[in-house]
Amino acid sequence: ARVYNQKNINFIIADFRGYGFSNGTPTAKNTKSDAHPVLDYVLWHLKKENYIGPLILMGRSLGSVSVLELAQRYPNDFRGLIIESGFANEEPLFRLFGMTPEQVGFKIEDGFQNGAKISKYQGPLLVIHAQQDHIIPFSQGEELLNLCPSKKKKLVPIPNANHNNILGVNPQKYFEEVERFIHALNKG
């Protein structure tokens, strides 16, 4: 968050239940439903403080589920979307645990449906993905970009980075791209 503040970008971070400093048990349902009260609070707070800048949603990895849920539900409440290391479908998550969706009786309609949600998103989109991501393959970032019908979209590959060190490998490129995206939204 310090780097964002140095660039005059306000940033609010929310953990999932059971992650970071948050208690509770993480579930697929909570991943989607918990995003709504967080956005409600953010919108209330921004209104209270007379904030006039653009609101941009950003989700990292599993956070792509939350921001795409919000993008589908509240498309007029924010101006842009940043997805870092996100996924279009759940297949990489199953592979991570050494199984296939079929082995556990998983059906696409039971999943997060990130691909279906991004295929309806028309606003500005920035996708940042590590090229050597060992958890969510780079091809998932490409798929998110390709499924999105927006005319204002960009994929930023981070070479030599994996899922967990994407910020540390080339922070200059990472933050330049985020800053460029945000400033373009401020002008538009």
Features from the language model and the residues they span:
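Hydrolase active-site cap/lid region
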Residues: 66-123
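Short alpha-helix in the alpha/beta-hydrolase fold that links the catalytic acid
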Residues: 114, 123, 137-146
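Short beta-strand/loop motif that positions the catalytic acidic residue
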Residues: 120-122, 127-129, 133
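Conserved alpha/beta-hydrolase
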Residues: 1-23
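Acidic catalytic loop of the alpha/beta-hydrolase fold
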Residues: 132-136, 163-165
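Catalytic histidine-centered segment of alpha/beta-hydrolase-like enzymes
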Residues: 161-175
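Alpha/beta-hydrolase fold nucleophile elbow
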Residues: 48-61
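Alpha/beta-hydrolase active-site loop
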Residues: 26-48, 116
